[in-house]
């Protein structure tokens, strides 16, 4: 089962992206480097609660 998650920038805490995640195969918090339009650069985005 895939769940919808929200990705937030670790620098400015803005919620920029949504994606899906399979909870069976991916344990823990999802992290990926993506572009943050508020910081105007590529930053680490982490799954929020």
Swiss-Prot record:
What highest taxon heads this organism's lineage?
Bacteria
Q: Which gene encodes it?
A: rpmG
A GO BP term here is:
translation
Give the organism, scientific name: Syntrophus aciditrophicus (strain SB)
What is the disulfide pattern of this chain? none
Task: Please report the name of this protein according to its UniProt entry.
Answer: Large ribosomal subunit protein bL33
| Keywords from the UniProt entry | Ribonucleoprotein, Ribosomal protein
Write down the SUPFAM superfamilies for this protein, in alphabetical order.
Zn-binding ribosomal proteins
Q: Which family does it belong to?
A: Belongs to the bacterial ribosomal protein bL33 family.
Q: Name one GO cellular component term.
A: ribonucleoprotein complex
For this chain, one GO molecular function annotation is: structural constituent of ribosome
Pfam families associated with the record:
Ribosomal_L33 (PF00471)
